[in-house]
């Protein structure tokens, strides 16, 4: 798999709980720990350091539909997320 861009999801968990690889973390395996997980996505980076979204109108995670694949890019974090067609926003803000 090609290398992930910064804060691009490296693994997506399927509805059945299977790990679906999306890209690689500069040759390392995609982490499997909670500090790298948001919703059903895992990221190469520790996501706990990503800043909290300031409002519920903000795009928290962009969904990028490529040819035969889908990518997720993290911009800011929420306490809970709301899914839209091409992005996730915050249903509930952190703090």
Curated annotation (Swiss-Prot):
| Keywords for this protein | Disulfide bond, Ion channel impairing toxin, Neurotoxin, Secreted, Toxin
- How would you describe the post-translational modification of this protein? Contains 5 disulfide bonds.
GO-annotated molecular function: ion channel regulator activity; toxin activity
Highest taxon of the lineage: Eukaryota
> Mainly resides where?
secreted
Compartments reported by the entry: Secreted
* Secreted recorded as keyword: yes
Kindly list any coiled-coil regions of this protein.
Answer: none
How is this protein annotated for GO cellular component? extracellular region
**From which residue to which does the signal peptide run?**
none
Tell whether Transmembrane helix is among the UniProt keywords.
Answer: no
According to UniProt, the tissues expressing it are described as: Expressed by the venom duct.
- Domain characteristics, as noted in the entry: The cysteine framework is VIII (C-C-C-C-C-C-C-C-C-C).
Please describe what this protein does.
Acts as a neurotoxin by inhibiting an ion channel.
Q: What is this protein called?
A: Turripeptide OL184
Protein's organism: Iotyrris olangoensis
């Amino acid at each position: 798999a090609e290398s992930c861009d910064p804060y691009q999801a490296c693994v997506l968990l399927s509805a059945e709980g299977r790990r679906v690889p999306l890209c690689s973390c500069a040759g390392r395996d995609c982490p499997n720990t909670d500090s790298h997980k948001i919703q059903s996505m895992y990221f190469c980076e520790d996501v706990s350091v990503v800043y909290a979204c300031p409002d519920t109108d903000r795009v928290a995670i962009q969904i990028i539909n490529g040819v035969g694949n889908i990518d997720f890019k993290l911009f800011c974090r929420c306490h809970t997320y709301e899914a839209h067609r091409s992005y996730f926003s915050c249903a509930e803000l952190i703090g």
